[in-house]
Amino acid sequence: MAVGLFGGSFNPPHDGHALVAETALRRLGLDQLWWMVTPGNPLKDRNHLAPLGERIAMSEKIARNPRIKVTAFEQALGQSYTARTLEVIRARNRDVRFVWVMGADNLKNFHRWQDWRKIVATFPIAVVDRPGSTLAYLSSPMARAFSSARVDEDDAGTLAFRRAPAWTFIHGPRSGLSSTALRSAKSG
């Protein structure tokens, strides 16, 4: 089984997130995608974070595909660092092929994530296009450091069966929605 792991604060989740999830399912040939709502992001201000239960409920509303499973198991782990979460997932699911899925807008700060190189070494990564990030991803520290591990987009369907480090950039339909903009509009 091939499973995409799509983690984030989803504060709030929106149709742009659903588009990334659907694009990953289709282009990577995944059997499932686990939409992992994190209890908190160490790189973001917790003062503006909606309650976890609210973010889970909203995620379930917009993740309409039955192959998308919304989960918040990081809370049960007492964990909010992706590298550690991925280690636990791998240990508990030895027979599953995983791909870490992220929007291209996260790539510019990916090198600031705790143990980001360990994340790259744990599972293959699919970076899905987002507005304003199409060309910028090439200059990101991760793209430069792992340029030799880049898989051609035409071979994205093989990513789950490759050994890490391996990554690809997937072009496709994009949504201009952003959680930051939605929060600003709601408070302003």
Curated annotation (Swiss-Prot):
Q: What keywords are assigned to this protein?
A: ATP-binding, NAD, Nucleotide-binding, Nucleotidyltransferase, Pyridine nucleotide biosynthesis, Transferase
Under which EC number(s) is this enzyme classified? 2.7.7.18
ATP-binding found in the keyword field: yes
Q: Which domain of life is it from?
A: Bacteria
Q: Which GO terms describe its biological process?
A: NAD biosynthetic process
Q: Which reaction does it catalyse?
A: nicotinate beta-D-ribonucleotide + ATP + H(+) = deamido-NAD(+) + diphosphate
Kindly tell me the pathway this chain contributes to.
Cofactor biosynthesis; NAD(+) biosynthesis; deamido-NAD(+) from nicotinate D-ribonucleotide: step 1/1
UniProt GO molecular function: ATP binding; nicotinate-nucleotide adenylyltransferase activity
HAMAP family to which the protein is assigned, alphabetical: NaMN_adenylyltr
What's this chain's function?
A: Catalyzes the reversible adenylation of nicotinate mononucleotide (NaMN) to nicotinic acid adenine dinucleotide (NaAD).
State the protein's name: Probable nicotinate-nucleotide adenylyltransferase
Q: From what organism does this protein derive?
A: Rhizobium meliloti (strain 1021)
UniProt lineage:
Bacteria, Pseudomonadati, Pseudomonadota, Alphaproteobacteria, Hyphomicrobiales
